[in-house]
A protein has these predicted regions:
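Conserved catalytic core of the tyrosine transesterase superfamily
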Residues: 2-18, 22-31, 38, 52-327, ...
Length: 379
């Protein structure tokens, strides 16, 4: 709980706070708490009052964060968090003042409001025809083929395959449980019931399609890990033991009197081969682990030659943009490239607004749109 730097005591409406907590996701609550703590810390250091904040304080705070490198999208979130805490405390919202709106608009004008996009993980990579073209560049198929057949490899193959099929966000992906997978009309495919997502805080639920590829990967992982219920994607602890060479037993007369006497020193020891032990956890993976898993899979695929048209410099550049969201962006672009309409894409990825799917397709649309097609023809 954050103790805000207030000008005077504020009466808290406990019922309102409880209702907001019940209606919000844990991620949203953590984000609000983090944003308000940062704002309160800045106010204390600069002799300002956190609540009720003045429009001048909010505008100056946004300016300060912009000077520290915060992106316009982040500044918009900070503004929304400050507004929310004032609403929850039933005091005047300073972010509605024209000064705050104009200051934020000026920052966006200066820095640009284009939001950095996760590098897409498309199934065949940056291809024009998702059905006929051969895979190239960074592609999901290459990553899947490069997975090892040990427990971490089996889990990662299933994890990436499901992530691409469904376009789930990291928090939604790690929340998948065995019980959420149900039969489909196609006997080789399955359906995934999504009980709650970022855009479905009321828990109405949704359904996503799991390809036969994903079904096979899930079956291999759950059989090897002995998972029958509960979280599907779990942490795998790996313990590796080095090999030890055989040791001959020592003759008694070679043992110095200054050594501690131990008859076992006279016994030979057999060679011990290297071995690896795995321990599959009971709980689900943390959402923050998904991005690092994708990057580790990319490095492995590159080392195995599965991304043969990439150089080491290409790899370093690509890794910088890969995040847990890359599979969602990649699926979005593949759907556009395959000719699906916006309504179908919004339904498949459970979008409520067309803004984000269109933003994710911005670069692809420029190349494959009308102007791009014409220029490609005329050179």
């Amino acid at each position: 709980m954050t103790k805000l730097n207030c000008r005077s005591p504020i009466t808290i409406n406990a019922e309102l706070i409880a209702a907001y907590q019940a209606a919000s996701s844990p991620h949203s609550l953590r984000a609000l708490a983090s944003d308000i703590e940062a704002f309160d810390h800045w106010c204390r250091r600069n002799g300002r009052v956190t609540s009720p904040a003045t429009p001048e304080t909010v505008a100056d705070y946004l300016d300060a964060r912009a000077g520290q490198g915060a992106k316009p999208a982040s500044l918009g979130r900070y503004k929304a968090s400050i507004a929310k805490i004032h609403q929850l405390l039933d005091i005047k919202d300073p972010t509605q003042a024209e000064l705050v709106k104009l200051r934020l608009r000026a920052i966006r004008r200066e820095k640009g409001s284009t939001q950095a996009q996760a590098r897409p993980l498309r199934f065949k990579g940056p291809v024009r025809n998702v059905e006929r073209d051969a895979p190239r560049g960074l592609n999901v198929r290459g990553l899947l083929e490069a997975c090892a057949d040990d427990l971490p490899g089996l889990r990662n193959r299933a994890l990436l395959s499901v992530a691409y099929d469904t376009g789930l966000r990291a928090s939604e992906l790690v929340a998948v449980e065995v019980e959420h997978i149900v039969d489909a009309i196609d006997p080789e495919a399955r359906l995934l019931t999504i009980s709650r997502s970022k855009g479905d805080q009321e828990g109405k639920g949704a359904t996503a399609f799991l390809s036969p590829r994903s079904v096979r990967a899930i079956a291999a992982w759950t059989a090897a890990a002995d998972i029958e219920e509960g979280p599907l994607f779990r942490r795998v602890q790996v313990r590796r033991y080095k090999a030890r060479a055989a040791v001959k037993g020592r003759r008694i007369e070679t043992i110095s009197g200054r050594e501690s006497w131990d008859l076992r020193k006279t016994l030979p020891k057999s060679a011990v081969p290297a071995r690896t032990e795995y321990d599959v956890g009971e709980g689900a993976l943390h959402p923050g682990s998904i991005g690092p898993i994708w990057r580790a899979m990319i490095r492995r695929a590159f080392d195995k030659g599965a991304l043969s048209d990439l150089t080491a410099d290409d790899l370093a550049q690509l890794l910088k943009g890969v995040s847990a969201h890359s599979t969602r962006v990649g699926l979005n672009q593949d759907l556009f490239a395959s000719g699906e309409d916006l309504a179908g894409i919004m339904d498949a990825l459970r979008w409520k607004s067309p803004r984000m799917p269109l933003a994710y397709n911005r670069n692809l649309a420029a190349e494959q749109g009308a102007a791009g097609r014409l220029i490609a023809k005329i050179g």
